[in-house]
Amino acid sequence: MSKKVAVIIGSASKTSFNHLAVKYLQSIAPASLELNVVEVGDLPLYDRDLDEQDVPAYTRVREAVKASDAVIWVTPEHNGSYSAMLKNAIDVVSRPAGQSLWVGKPLGLSTVNASGSNRPVDALRTIAAGAYISMPVAPFAASVGGIFAGAFNEQGELVSEQAQGTLQGFINAYADFVARF
């Protein structure tokens, strides 16, 4: 039986390279993983006062994470770190206090950015280890660079052999990591 993986992408751009990379991951993922993108672009900015109200977008995202066996966070690099959109989703799912739905779910990290920098995933590791998140984090990540230098073609297909290899290695290792839980 395959593991259900909630994929949270920290970009809602219609031309998001992160979405294109996830589409590629979905096409190459081992049968042991079922990658499901959880849309977070419509989430209102987290506000603890809203925890007492019915916010359909909060409920939808929380339920999707709750129903998953594992999680992958995918982010562009914004000013040397992860995106505000991803951070907002992390906050929404980790609240109300004491009711975090992240706890114990094996986490994979990926970033698609201009340089291939690991800075966003390094910062996310710290968050994932926090008391309200407490996720086992894969000891590797997928960092894909060259997005403005031909990694993707005009049809949105990943054509960089290096990036393809990075993502293939990541998803195979992540499947092995998730199988331990």
Regions found by a protein language model. Name each.
Residues 36-44, 141-148:
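Short connector loops at secondary-structure junctions
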Residues 40-56, 151:
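N-terminal beta-loop-helix "entrance" segment that forms/cooperates
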Residues 18, 22, 58, 86, ...:
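A general structural signal for well-ordered alpha-helical segments in protein cores
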Residues 134-181:
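Glycine-rich phosphate/pyrophosphate-binding loop and the adjoining helix
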